[in-house]
Amino acid sequence: MFAIFQTGGKQYKVQQGEKIYVEKLDLEVGSKISFDQVIMVEGSVGTPFVKNAVVNATVLKQGKQKKINIIKFKSKKHHLKRQGHRQPYTQLVIDSISVK
């Protein structure tokens, strides 16, 4: 069984037991979370969400992605600006997908 749910402004297609990376959630490692904004479950599409559908997950890890470097350069002006960014993420494992 698969489901598509929404969190952090993005949509994720998941199956039970799958590990996914989502935008940072303010939760501790080992805590459980339920997503009720389920867009699709095994072929039944919601308008906009499927009623009584829930995706349950457990937080595995909190971390930061690989650093990206941003360089802004103006030619002939001897101006160079460097900046780095590491996007925070939360790794989840999908425990169950249920429709009541």
UniProtKB/Swiss-Prot annotation:
<keyword id="KW-0694">RNA-binding</keyword>
<comment type="subunit">
    <text>Part of the 50S ribosomal subunit. Contacts protein L20.</text>
</comment>
<protein>
    <recommendedName>
        <fullName>Large ribosomal subunit protein bL21</fullName>
    </recommendedName>
</protein>
<dbReference type="InterPro" id="IPR018258">
    <property type="entry name" value="Ribosomal_bL21_CS"/>
</dbReference>
<keyword id="KW-0699">rRNA-binding</keyword>
<keyword id="KW-0687">Ribonucleoprotein</keyword>
<dbReference type="GO" id="GO:0005737">
    <property type="term" value="C:cytoplasm"/>
</dbReference>
<dbReference type="GO" id="GO:0006412">
    <property type="term" value="P:translation"/>
</dbReference>
<comment type="similarity">
    <text>Belongs to the bacterial ribosomal protein bL21 family.</text>
</comment>
<dbReference type="GO" id="GO:0019843">
    <property type="term" value="F:rRNA binding"/>
</dbReference>
<keyword id="KW-0689">Ribosomal protein</keyword>
<dbReference type="InterPro" id="IPR028909">
    <property type="entry name" value="bL21-like"/>
</dbReference>
<dbReference type="Pfam" id="PF00829">
    <property type="entry name" value="Ribosomal_L21p"/>
</dbReference>
<comment type="function">
    <text>This protein binds to 23S rRNA in the presence of protein L20.</text>
</comment>
<dbReference type="GO" id="GO:0003735">
    <property type="term" value="F:structural constituent of ribosome"/>
</dbReference>
<dbReference type="InterPro" id="IPR036164">
    <property type="entry name" value="bL21-like_sf"/>
</dbReference>
<dbReference type="InterPro" id="IPR001787">
    <property type="entry name" value="Ribosomal_bL21"/>
</dbReference>
<dbReference type="GO" id="GO:1990904">
    <property type="term" value="C:ribonucleoprotein complex"/>
</dbReference>
<dbReference type="GO" id="GO:0005840">
    <property type="term" value="C:ribosome"/>
</dbReference>
